């Protein structure tokens, strides 16, 4: 027996049944959808609950979502001090390589938690005023890209 001569066992594979192709095909007329009605059509929209007040209208709402809000990955000076040697160049690519910043889609912001005496050259999407002040006080440089 060769590989191309292999066959499935009898009844192991069912043939696909094409519905709505006439009586002779076996699944004609109503095509397994029952009698004419709303659910025989292409379907209702997502979230439709048959006329009952849908979930997204029953649940109370609070506040609002600011369209212009930017979510940052925050990184502290303390973290950079522990992870990098003196005079290191720090940018988003390096932070992703070292797995300090996990999400490549979010911008990175430097915060002033902790302190450092190392002279870093930092290029990030955002930094707090205090963080910039601390890095420059240590002799480093911060550039917002």
From Swiss-Prot:
GO terms for cellular component: cytosolic large ribosomal subunit. Residues 1-13 have a biased composition (Basic and acidic residues). Residues 14-26 have a biased composition (Basic residues). GO terms for biological process: translation. PANTHER family: 50S RIBOSOMAL PROTEIN L15, LARGE RIBOSOMAL SUBUNIT PROTEIN UL15M. It holds the Pfam family Ribosomal_L27A. One of its GO terms (molecular function) is rRNA binding. Keywords: Ribonucleoprotein, Ribosomal protein, RNA-binding, rRNA-binding. This is Large ribosomal subunit protein uL15.
């Amino acid at each position: 027996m060769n590989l191309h001569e292999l066959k499935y066992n009898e009844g192991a594979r069912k043939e696909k049944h094409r519905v709505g192709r006439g009586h002779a095909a076996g699944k004609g007329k109503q095509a397994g959808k029952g009698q004419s009605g709303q659910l025989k059509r292409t379907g209702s929209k997502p979230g439709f609950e048959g006329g009952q007040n849908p979930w997204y209208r029953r649940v109370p709402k609070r506040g609002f979502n600011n369209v212009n809000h930017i979510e940052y990955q925050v990184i502290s000076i303390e973290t950079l001090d522990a992870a990098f040697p003196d005079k290191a160049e720090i940018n988003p690519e390096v932070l992703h390589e070292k797995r300090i910043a996990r999400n490549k889609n979010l911008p990175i912001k430097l915060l002033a938690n902790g302190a450092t005496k190392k002279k870093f050259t930092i290029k990030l999407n955002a930094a707090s005023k205090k963080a910039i002040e601390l890095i420059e006080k240590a002799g480093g440089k911060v550039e917002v890209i």
